Swiss-Prot record:
Transmembrane segments: none annotated. GO terms for molecular function: ATP binding; ATP hydrolysis activity; DNA replication origin binding; lipid binding. It is found in: Cytoplasm. ATP binds at residues 173, 175-177. One of its GO terms (biological process) is regulation of DNA replication. Its main location: cytoplasm. Residues 129-345 are annotated as: Domain III, AAA+ region. Domain I is involved in oligomerization and binding regulators, domain II is flexibile and of varying length in different bacteria, domain III forms the AAA+ region, while domain IV binds dsDNA. This is Chromosomal replication initiator protein DnaA. Oligomerizes as a right-handed, spiral filament on DNA at oriC.
Length: 465
């Protein structure tokens, strides 16, 4: 019996679990087999508890399948084992909301002198820029951002570990910046003298230009390559800035070699960033890449309720649902609308009711209703799937037509205030039960298929922009 037993388990788990789950929870585990005990090491308590709660039975079943009566006992521990083990990763589609580079070994025991042993370097004054108001505690979690939050939490607990770099991507106002600051605050809480630097990518460019003008490029390099964690927002703004990309390429390599944490955000998947060198885009995907989706209705309601609570405002549930059903694109838009409602209520002394909200947000709501119509949804979906609008309205039942039709119906329910019968009528006079079935089918497929989930998110972004 040897570690090949765990490798067999890994191979089976890769086949049995969704790629996202395997990448997030199973891949970071390290294994040690001795005295008929298989010890699995998790990078932190969060991962340990999750794996033990969700996958303990799966692993025990596999051990019994492979070993029968000789199956080893299973033990979980937090920590790392001084061993590097490379496992074969499944091919990742660029449409996957979570991807981990195939060519990278699992880093079993990173040596992190900057985290554990090094004194604080006094040669620079570090501009942390981490906003203490953005933490994991006040980040509202939902299906749309659950994986991103979990990955960020793990990085905060174990910087420089398996998820380095961490790349978060998604549309504007979905919480990427909040998570960057939350990671920074988490690292600083763990080690107050850690050198954590947050910045927008344009600040990196500005600093480099200033260093070139002042003949201080070596000082620039020392500054950025000696941080413990570098958090860069909107990396897509490096596009077509060749000298900045060159400098960041070498900075990236230096930080990764030193097991210093890198977290990047963008509005698109790394390989889809135009104007950025392929060697950089490749490195962006070396660690963990996670998408943040537009928030679903329940998460939008939770965001509004939490924001109101932070402002000591009582927001009736029906009012929160009214706003959330009509403003769907991003968190920033939701919070801006609520701030407007609160300000109007404070100025007028009126209670916050649905009628009051309808009046306070009348121009915003009118704009939303004008932007997203069933006709617009049908046109956008037809163009996306390269079919005719007439196909969506027809009685054709081939998958190439039926699936886009179901997608369009689900989007109409999500993005408009039309009833199911009204939506059915707009799709060739179909019954409301057909619309309900379509919505449930798309919801199911979004859980099972990365491509369907990505299609849904792309269409939401297109229709909401």
């Amino acid at each position: 019996m040897s570690l090949s037993l765990w490798q067999q388990c890994l191979a089976r788990l890769q086949d049995e679990l969704p790629a996202t789950e395997f990448s997030m929870w199973i891949r970071p585990l390290q294994a040690e087999l001795s005295d008929n005990t298989l010890a699995l090491y998790a990078p932190n308590r969060f991962v340990l508890d999750w794996v033990r709660d969700k996958y303990l039975n799966n692993i025990n079943v596999l051990l019994n399948d492979f070993c029968g009566m000789d199956a080893p006992l299973l033990r979980f521990e937090v920590g790392s084992k001084p061993l590097v083990q490379t496992i074969s990763q499944p091919a990742q589609s660029h449409h996957n909301p979570v991807s981990v580079a195939r060519q990278q070994p699992v880093r079993m025991a990173p040596v992190r002198p900057s985290w554990d042993n090094s004194p604080v370097q006094a040669e620079h004054t570090y501009r942390s820029n981490v906003n203490p108001k953005h933490t994991f505690d006040n980040f509202v979690e939902g299906k749309s951002n659950q994986l991103a939050r979990a990955a960020a939490r793990q990085v905060a607990d174990n910087p420089g570990g398996a998820y380095n770099p961490l790349f978060l991507y998604g549309g504007t106002g979905l919480g990427k910046t909040h998570l960057l600051h939350a990671v920074g605050n988490g690292i600083i809480a763990r080690k107050p003298n850690a050198k954590v630097v947050y910045m927008h990518s344009e600040r990196f460019v500005q600093d480099m230009v200033k260093a070139l003008q002042n003949n201080a490029i070596e000082e620039f390099k020392r500054y950025y390559r000696s941080v413990d964690a570098l958090l860069i927002d909107d990396i897509q703004f490096f596009a077509n800035k060749e000298r900045s990309q060159e400098e960041f390429f070498h900075t990236f390599n230096a930080l990764l070699e030193g097991n210093q944490q890198i977290i990047l955000t963008s509005d698109r998947y790394p390989k889809e960033i135009n104007g950025v060198e392929d060697r950089l885009k490749s490195r962006f995907g070396w660690g963990l890449t996670v998408a943040i989706e537009p928030p679903e209705l329940e998460t939008r309601v939770a965001i509004l309720m939490k924001k109101a609570d932070e402002n000591d405002i009582r927001l009736p549930g029906e009012v929160a649902f009214f706003i959330a059903k009509r403003l769907r694109s991003n968190v920033r838009e939701l919070e801006g609308a609520l701030n407007r409602v609160i300000a109007n209520a404070n100025f007028t002394g009126r209670s916050i009711t649905i009628d009051f909200v309808r009046e306070a947000l009348r121009d915003l709501l009118a704009l939303q209703e004008k932007l997203v119509t069933i006709d617009n949804i049908q046109k956008t979906v037809a163009e996306y799937y390269k079919i005719k609008i007439a196909d969506l309205l027809s009685k054709r039942r081939s998958r190439s037509v039926a699936r886009p039709r179901q997608m369009a119906m689900a989007l109409a329910k999500e993005l408009t205030n039309h009833s199911l019968p009204e939506i059915g009528d707009a799709f060739g006079g179909r019954d409301h039960t057909t619309v309900l079935h379509a919505c449930r089918k798309i919801e199911q497929l979004r859980e099972e298929s990365h491509d369907i989930k990505e299609d849904f998110s792309n269409l939401i972004r297109t229709l909401s922009s």
